[in-house]
């Protein structure tokens, strides 16, 4: 079992938290992490690209000239693909790029990125993040006390609305819960700031 220093909101040590090695101490599988990140990035694509094919382009209903006798190549419509202003052949149409990977693959990827952050000492555990009201300045003080000045993913327990609202307007800070933190978000973050309750939930979900 890996031990991680537990801090409070003021940056002082408040003990240690024991992490489950089956989740936070495995050998990262980079191939699986790569596959899941590609999948999650694909699902973020809007897929709203569209062009007009020859049936959608305005005009072109009349044959431009008669079939025979002009000496010119036969044409059926001025909106054929070879014409300027004609329809596009096999152009992109709106579609979803999302695809699913097996649950075992996604869970292994989560365990891999969590383990990597712990191994690189980029996993900061805090006993709680309690605020009486949404205060961005107060959350900024917490980050400063914990010496976090880079891209950070804050992983909270469910229902901690004040902490989530306090953090979301700070540049470089992204907020998620133990059940919504994605492999892409975790991999992109320079550090993870995780509450003790969120750690317990992560271990419950991925056990």
Curated annotation (Swiss-Prot):
From what superkingdom does this record's organism come?
A: Bacteria
Q: Name one GO cellular component term.
A: ribonucleoprotein complex
Biological process terms in GO annotation: translation
Sorted alphabetically, which keywords does the UniProt record give? Ribonucleoprotein, Ribosomal protein, RNA-binding, rRNA-binding
Q: Where is this region: Disordered?
A: 49-78
What GO MF annotations does this protein's record show? rRNA binding; structural constituent of ribosome
Pfam families registered for this protein in UniProt: Ribosomal_L4
The answer to whether keyword rRNA-binding applies is yes
Q: Does the keyword RNA-binding apply?
A: yes
Q: Which HAMAP family match?
A: Ribosomal_uL4_B
Quaternary structure note: Part of the 50S ribosomal subunit.
Q: What does this protein do?
A: One of the primary rRNA binding proteins, this protein initially binds near the 5'-end of the 23S rRNA. It is important during the early stages of 50S assembly. It makes multiple contacts with different domains of the 23S rRNA in the assembled 50S subunit and ribosome. Forms part of the polypeptide exit tunnel.
NCBIfam families per UniProt: rplD_bact (TIGR03953)
Please give the family membership noted in the entry: Belongs to the universal ribosomal protein uL4 family.
Q: What is this protein called?
A: Large ribosomal subunit protein uL4
| Record lineage | Bacteria, Bacillati, Bacillota, Bacilli, Lactobacillales
């Amino acid at each position: 079992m890996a031990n991680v220093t537990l801090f409070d909101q003021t940056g002082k040590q408040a003990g240690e938290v024991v992490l489950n090695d089956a989740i936070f101490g495995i050998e990262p599988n980079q191939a699986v992490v790569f596959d899941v990140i590609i999948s999650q990035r694909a699902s973020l694509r809007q897929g709203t690209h569209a062009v007009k094919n020859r049936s959608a382009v305005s005009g072109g209903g009349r044959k431009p000239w008669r079939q025979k006798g002009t000496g010119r190549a036969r044409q059926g419509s001025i909106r054929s693909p070879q014409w300027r202003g004609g329809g596009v052949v096999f152009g992109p149409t709106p579609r979803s790029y999302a695809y699913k990977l097996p649950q075992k693959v996604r869970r292994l990827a989560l365990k891999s990125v969590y383990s990597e952050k712990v191994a690189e000492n980029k996993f900061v555990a805090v006993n709680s993040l309690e605020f009486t009201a949404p205060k961005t300045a107060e959350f900024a003080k917490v980050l400063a006390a914990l010496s976090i000045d880079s891209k950070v993913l804050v992983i909270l327990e469910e229902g901690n609305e004040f902490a989530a609202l306090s953090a979301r307007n700070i540049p470089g800070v992204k907020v998620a819960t133990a059940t919504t933190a994605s492999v892409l978000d975790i991999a992109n973050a320079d550090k993870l700031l995780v509450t003790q309750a969120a750690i317990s939930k992560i271990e419950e979900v991925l056990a």
